[in-house]
């Protein structure tokens, strides 16, 4: 199956006179199932709709919007696989030097706040065209939200973008329903009933009777306590079974969030990943320059989506939901055989997983009938008694992949949830993970070691991680392997004081670890942690918490994790002095730094 058209010449070659949809994306067009643009476009194609891709249009050029003419049914707009502001800026708000989703890594080929800019330009050239926005940037900004880069609460992106309809979450079924209704003759303004969408109205009579009324934009913009309360209502209404419609007044309009789209069945997941992807970047874009984002995912396999891990700093609950959706073994093997047939395949499957590699089934049987629990998490602070812990099916897939002709090694790199591994009374998965699926080092995410901070993060306590580490190295010894463990660590998370950061530094000292990279907490839209950062409250309890907000303190906490780096000496010295931890300044084996000369 050829690539979808990215210019007028290709549109003509595809015998398209007037496309049903023009898909505007902030990414370079890669026809691979790891890219939402490719999935949605191929789904539409499967159901008989024509789609042309307008990849990274230059908003300064008026003519770019006329490349395919105006679409018959509507414009589809996303910023790409990543929020455009996260894509462009570090947590320190410095401009990044490269863009992995752009040919040649060139930064600036998409604008800041890409969806807003794209839609405003489309509205200028096609005032009556239907505009539908989706993807991560739209999904996580679907209602009023704290924006770290402006340091203020912004309105729903459907207001600022002038879009007609917003698709949130994973939109395969939603976009087909929208397309079918538009094709039947309904106007975009009629589509106020579709699950997994957000719409706006000035007509109070259109608001569903069952809708929960949220505090207004003006109120949450000025009152942090109200902001936290509003966020928790949103957070607890992400489930397709238990979730209610939400209504947020925004000045002279109302923003309505319809209930979430139901999770895909296994058969539906297979249909998505069996679509005829080319599995690489469009050749015209490759001529301009390599798209680095393809490197890791080209020979990787996604087997699931959704996550019930409940990490506070993660947006998965708000975007993909807590119900695990997974593919069948047959579907995974079919994709593996496609990868093996790639002339550039060297025998190594880079990854087999998803948001959490070893979540292959829903957390419990009741989720599919009654929905997820709104008043508790599956794993934190302790695992629910109804949690099903079973790696059997995932392990069966890995074993089958290992035996395929042409495969030398199958790696698992996409976030093994170590607590779930430890809760499994059967060691087969852990043993085979260590024996066959680690590429020299296993990356896991304890994130911190202070239990106070871990509770705010929604992560298991340090004691469980210590048990995991011990067992990991024992298995390596039993298997006569010398493999390492790389812990992901986060500095400056809400609730983390200098004393907590020092506890983490002491742990790093004690295990002899020298981290090359540190993730400073990044307040991205629609997470619990970002709400903590903005409000100074834990929205689950409404109790005040300490927030390391100044760039200087964040730099000190980050430096403590890398205290061995001579460049960090002054910051580490200042942090230890502020915390009165002079016992860690000296020449003893427990000291972090030497005294100043």
Regions found by a protein language model. Give the residues of each.
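Conserved SAM/AdoMet-binding glycine-rich loop
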Residues: 23, 39, 54, 58-59, ...
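Terminal amphipathic helices with adjacent charged low-complexity linkers/tails
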Residues: 60, 189-238, 252, 261-264, ...
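Flexible glycine/acidic-rich beta-alpha junction loops that bind and position SAM and/or redox cofactors
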Residues: 83-92, 140-142, 172-177, 202-205, ...
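N-terminal pre-triad scaffold of radical SAM enzymes
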Residues: 24-27, 288-315, 348
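Conserved, mostly hydrophobic/aromatic
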Residues: 164, 272, 311, 332, ...
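Radical SAM enzyme core and accessory elements
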Residues: 2-6, 221-261, 268, 274, ...
